[in-house]
């Protein structure tokens, strides 16, 4: 199975995928420290930084399992709940990536 992740963090999904014998094709994480962790542990996986600037069409039909958790701050009761007015409102970018990848 081929796995890829969006909003990857430090790679919990990648570790689980590896434990199941899956191949980690790519990860996408904007924060520098988590991205460095991912690059260290998964050097054969392509690394993307900014989901808003990444074209995923090259992965169309090549990913079996796509994982990811888009930022929840725009909706969180702990925050200001600005929804689409929050610059962290990235659900539309995740949907675009899903459509391009078509897992």
Report residues per predicted region.
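Conserved active-site and SAM-binding loop architecture
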Residues: 1-103
């Amino acid at each position: 199975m081929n796995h890829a992740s969006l909003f990857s963090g430090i790679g919990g999904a990648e570790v689980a995928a590896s434990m199941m014998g899956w191949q980690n094709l790519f990860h996408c994480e904007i924060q520098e420290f988590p991205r460095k962790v991912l690059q260290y542990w998964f050097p054969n996986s392509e690394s993307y930084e900014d989901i808003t600037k990444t074209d995923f069409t090259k992965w169309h039909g090549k990913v079996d399992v796509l994982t990811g958790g888009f930022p929840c701050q725009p909706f969180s009761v702990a925050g200001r709940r600005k929804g689409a007015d929050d610059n962290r409102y990235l659900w539309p970018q995740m949907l675009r990536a899903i459509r391009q990848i078509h897992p």
